[in-house]
Amino acid sequence: MFNKVERLSPNISGKQKKKKQIILTNTGRDVEEYLTSLKYRMNGKFKRVPHYIVTKDGNVIQTLPDETYSNYFTEPNINRNSIIVSFENLGWLEKVPLKDYYTNWIGNIYKGSAYEKKWRDYFLWEPYTEIQMQS
């Protein structure tokens, strides 16, 4: 399913040339909390808005028109030349000692199985859902 939502950031630039790359990220929290944070952080002037969000149940939400960009990264050329797709996912996880769950960088609890893959200093990740991968 594909949904468009109201423009979440006034900090987008006008029309640009064709995009050259797609960058995949994660939301770091559930989609409702993420959308709320985008809409209300810094009085609606939050600059890091992806073009699309893919929810755990496979819905795709468009938050910005493809031909525009937000200041998602600190490098302007990356922003202007990229489509940013953010997957609903907690991202990297830490195992809570003596507990049967994990937490992410903002303290969200995850009780499923973690995917083990070293990247920088992180080793455990919330897996993406199969339907997200198909979206």
Which residues fall in each region the model found?
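Active-site-adjacent loop/helix surface patches within enzyme catalytic domains
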Residues: 2-135
